[in-house]
Amino acid sequence: MDYNRMNSFLEYPLCNRGSSAYSAHSAPTSFPPSSAQAVDSYASEGRYGGGLSSPAFQQNSGYPAQQPPSTLGVPFPSSAPSGYAPAACSPSYGPSQYYPLGQSEGDGGYFHPSSYGAQLGGLSDGYGAGGAGPGPYPPQHPPYGNEQTASFAPAYADLLSEDKETPCPSEPNTPTXRTFDWMKVKRNPPKTAKVSEPGLGSPSGLRTNFTTRQLTELEKEFHFNKYLSRARRVEIAATLELNETQVKIWFQNRRMKQKKREREGGRVPPAPPGCPKEAAGDASDQSTCTSPEASPSSVTS
């Protein structure tokens, strides 16, 4: 077997790969001859070249056809010329180990330490921490695959768990959150008559409680005028601190009461001396118009 020719095949692609494809610790290009037989267990160790090997090289070295990098998931192109076979290891090489290079390598190459020299014996141990373990094949996944991202999974899981946590409950509003016992009781305010401004109508459904002074002034006005004009009604309301509607309703009720007394008595009693005729029916209600001729019914009423 012509090892000089094989070394020339190895040297050419190694010198033309570029500085980013291999480690600084390169293996020597000349090897002592070996009588070991060619075996097929390391048939796919040519990881640096691309394309298929030539038939002549397969006959000389006894190696089967090399697999293209596309089948291994390595995205680097081939730098070997068309007339040369890809770089391959000598049969005297031991089992190879492949270690992925750093992130700066863009061609996705693997570091291939040599196991034949004593000066490079500890090289595989130095790179063993970041490698994929012993074996003739590189890992079946591209760099930064599931193995590299697995270390970030706990950190991402923690971030997701923090995002899914329920936010802190906001402080409850005191007026709406706290309900006291006295707030549950439905309270109906008492209906009390309040003095309204003159000229405004009183609320419906409320009974006005007149004072003694107001009743006295209204009775005096009723004895002289059973029907009031608009101007007189506004004047009386302003004097008695009432509104116009209250004065109007009081005079309506007072006229109805007078008619009821006339129907019950049959006739209007004669007016006492000194009293006007209009106030004859109301003689019993007037303290100034009393006479001994007044009927008992009118006095009691």
From Swiss-Prot:
<keyword id="KW-0539">Nucleus</keyword>
<protein>
    <recommendedName>
        <fullName>Homeobox protein Hox-B1</fullName>
    </recommendedName>
</protein>
<dbReference type="InterPro" id="IPR001356">
    <property type="entry name" value="HD"/>
</dbReference>
<feature type="region of interest" description="Disordered">
    <location>
        <begin position="254"/>
        <end position="301"/>
    </location>
</feature>
<feature type="region of interest" description="Disordered">
    <location>
        <begin position="189"/>
        <end position="208"/>
    </location>
</feature>
<keyword id="KW-0217">Developmental protein</keyword>
<comment type="similarity">
    <text>Belongs to the Antp homeobox family. Labial subfamily.</text>
</comment>
<dbReference type="InterPro" id="IPR020479">
    <property type="entry name" value="HD_metazoa"/>
</dbReference>
<feature type="region of interest" description="Disordered">
    <location>
        <begin position="19"/>
        <end position="77"/>
    </location>
</feature>
<dbReference type="GO" id="GO:0000981">
    <property type="term" value="F:DNA-binding transcription factor activity, RNA polymerase II-specific"/>
</dbReference>
<comment type="function">
    <text>Sequence-specific transcription factor which is part of a developmental regulatory system that provides cells with specific positional identities on the anterior-posterior axis. Acts on the anterior body structures.</text>
</comment>
<feature type="compositionally biased region" description="Polar residues">
    <location>
        <begin position="55"/>
        <end position="70"/>
    </location>
</feature>
<dbReference type="InterPro" id="IPR017970">
    <property type="entry name" value="Homeobox_CS"/>
</dbReference>
<feature type="region of interest" description="Disordered">
    <location>
        <begin position="127"/>
        <end position="149"/>
    </location>
</feature>
<keyword id="KW-0804">Transcription</keyword>
<feature type="short sequence motif" description="Antp-type hexapeptide">
    <location>
        <begin position="179"/>
        <end position="184"/>
    </location>
</feature>
<keyword id="KW-0805">Transcription regulation</keyword>
<dbReference type="InterPro" id="IPR009057">
    <property type="entry name" value="Homeodomain-like_sf"/>
</dbReference>
<keyword id="KW-0238">DNA-binding</keyword>
<feature type="compositionally biased region" description="Polar residues">
    <location>
        <begin position="284"/>
        <end position="301"/>
    </location>
</feature>
<dbReference type="GO" id="GO:0005634">
    <property type="term" value="C:nucleus"/>
</dbReference>
<dbReference type="Pfam" id="PF00046">
    <property type="entry name" value="Homeodomain"/>
</dbReference>
<dbReference type="InterPro" id="IPR046327">
    <property type="entry name" value="HXA1/B1/D1"/>
</dbReference>
<feature type="DNA-binding region" description="Homeobox">
    <location>
        <begin position="203"/>
        <end position="262"/>
    </location>
</feature>
<keyword id="KW-0371">Homeobox</keyword>
<feature type="compositionally biased region" description="Polar residues">
    <location>
        <begin position="19"/>
        <end position="38"/>
    </location>
</feature>
<dbReference type="GO" id="GO:0000978">
    <property type="term" value="F:RNA polymerase II cis-regulatory region sequence-specific DNA binding"/>
</dbReference>
